Structures are given as C-alpha cells and as structure tokens.
Amino acid sequence: MEILLANPRGFCAGVDRAISIVERALDIFEKPIYVRHEVVHNRYVVDGLKSRGAVFVEELDQIPDDSIVIFSAHGVSQAVRTEAKRRDLKIFDATCPLVTKVHMEVTRASRKGIECILIGHQGHPEVEGTMGQYGNDGGGIYLVETVEDVAKLNVKNADNLFYCSQTTLSVDDTADVIDALRAKFPAIDGPRKDDICYATQNRQDAVRDLADKVDVLLVVGAKNSSNSNRLRELADKMGTKAYLIDDATNVQESWFTGINAVGVTAGASAPEVLVQQVITRLKELGGNQVTENPGEEENIVFAVPIELR
C-alpha cells in the first residue's frame, strides 16, 4: 500500500504565530498565562501548552484581574476586547492577521453604516469575533452559510451592502454563496482580495490534486477544526473516501482492505508530529513506499508582538 502525502499540509503562518505567542509568554512572564479559547483547534497542541502553565478559559470572568490574557488565533469581538481593557488585563493578541483583515472590513462597513453579510459557520469562534466587530445600530450584520440562507435573507437597504467571509471555508461552497448574493443583491460590494486565506486555499488545492491518486484519504485534524472538516468534505465530494482523525490511534485497519494507495493530509492547526505518527501506524498496517506529492510552497511568516521577541 503506497502512502502519498499532501503538500502543503499542517501548520499555517497564523497558527505558528499563535502558538509562538503563548510559548514566548510562558518563557517571559510569571505563570499562569491565561488563553481565551483554545489558541488553535488541536488537542495535542493545547495539552502541550497546558503542561507548560497555560490556562485555557472560555470567558474573561474566569480570569483574575491584572492577569495576562492571550486571545486565540480565531479573534474576539470588540466587546471582549473592551472588557479585557476595562479590567486592566495585559493583552497579547494571537488573532491571525488574515482574520484581522476581515475584522477591519467589518469595522469599516459599520462606521459607514453599510449593512454587512458574513459568510460563515454559526457558533464558530472566528464568526463570533467577526460579527462582534459591527456596532452600528443603523445598519446590521447578517450571517449566511448556504445558498438557501441567501434566498431567505432580508436586509434594510439592498443598495448599501458588503459581504465578507470566514477565512477557513470551502472555496467552492463560498463561491456559490457569493454568486447567490450577487444575483439577489446586484449592488453588493465585497473585499478586494478574497477573505478565505492562502493556507485554506492551498490545502484544499492539495486535496484536489491528491484525491484522484488515492483510494482513501486521512485528514489529521480536530473535529472542531473548520479547515480540517472542509478538507474531508472536499475529498468526499470528489468521490474519495475520507476520514477526519485526531491522531494515529483513530486509524482503523478495516479502512484499508483492498486499498492500493492512501493519502494523508493535515489541517492548518495539526502539527507534523501527528502526521508522522499516522505514517508509522500505516506502515504497521502494510504501508510501504511514502511519497511527498508536490504542491504550492509556502514561505509566509507572521511576526509575534515586539514585547515577546
């Protein structure tokens, strides 16, 4: 059984930066260091940071006054940021710069009184943070996920609209939603550059290229990782059976009966060590030749805050 590895896979620049911010804070400041929400959606990463003294919470009221708080890569609402400042919490912001770009788009729309339509998944922390950038009662911000949502959507002024999107969505599905928005609201404006980030695009392109070459695809990533779920869904849509796994312990021998080639990729918040453990497990199940499938080279790096360098 041949093992083909997708490229690029695993950590993106935003995830690297977020983890580095927590690690540097742990090195420099007295523990505990509080992190609002999982800094990235991966249990292996979170547990490693916990073992070093990071404390993960969901709400600011779980954090003592005058503590250090790190906002996760997914970003936070203006209300959360304001509350943290009110309580004199020392803030380090690990929000991905590409999420911050979307925040700025929403903030500009809010200031101008332009209604905003966000394409994203209800309940995802990135969506909650982005929705929370809009503060103009005279306008409004609306969340849509599907073409069907667009059909049901009513706005105040169809001639004064802006759309943006969560950064980790399916490229194809989002294009369909944007087409539906433009058909229903011809005057709608959008970002000059797509909001879906380079890493999401590249990892989906890598799955597109790999899916036809393998019988089964394993996606290493957490169940609550949006971009990892999109990779599994994309392979399924292409007719390749795909499984989303946390780590090698989830790999089942029955998946590979009569299989000639298995593909492996990883979501943007999954470390390479988990991929290597999956490869070891596949070799135990009869995998032999390991081949790196060529793909887009990524050289993007996001700097950590000056105080943590």
UniProtKB/Swiss-Prot annotation:
CDD domains with a match to the protein in the record: lytB_ispH
UniProt keyword DNA-binding present: no
Active-site residue list: E126
Described function: Catalyzes the conversion of 1-hydroxy-2-methyl-2-(E)-butenyl 4-diphosphate (HMBPP) into a mixture of isopentenyl diphosphate (IPP) and dimethylallyl diphosphate (DMAPP). Acts in the terminal step of the DOXP/MEP pathway for isoprenoid precursor biosynthesis.
UniProt source species: Pseudoalteromonas translucida (strain TAC 125)
Binding site for [4Fe-4S] cluster: C12, C96, C197
Family according to the record: Belongs to the IspH family.
Keywords: 4Fe-4S, Iron, Iron-sulfur, Isoprene biosynthesis, Metal-binding, Oxidoreductase
Protein name in the entry: 4-hydroxy-3-methylbut-2-enyl diphosphate reductase
